[in-house]
Amino acid sequence: MKRRPRKWKKKGRMRWKWIKKRIRRLKRQRRKERGLI
């Protein structure tokens, strides 16, 4: 494994948080669709 710079670690964490937010939004949209059907 190659050593990663500290800057990359911070960016990785931000990206992970952003991905989690997207997943939550998708789940909320699906719940709304189920309620309408």
Curated annotation (Swiss-Prot):
Transmembrane helix keyword on record: no
One GO CC annotation: ribosome
Entry keyword Nuclease: no
Keywords noted in UniProt: Ribonucleoprotein, Ribosomal protein
Further remark: Initially thought to be part of the large ribosomal subunit. Crystal structures show eS32/eL41 to be a small ribosomal subunit forming a bridge at the interface of the 2 subunits.
Role this protein plays: Interacts with N(4)-acetylcytidine (ac(4)C) 1459 of the small rRNA; the acetyl group of ac(4)C1459 briges the interaction with this protein.
Oligomer status and interactors: Part of the small ribosomal subunit.
Family: Belongs to the eukaryotic ribosomal protein eS32 family.
Protein name, entry field: Small ribosomal subunit protein eS32
Organism: Thermococcus kodakarensis (strain ATCC BAA-918 / JCM 12380 / KOD1) (Pyrococcus kodakaraensis (strain KOD1))
Protein encoded by which gene: rpl41e
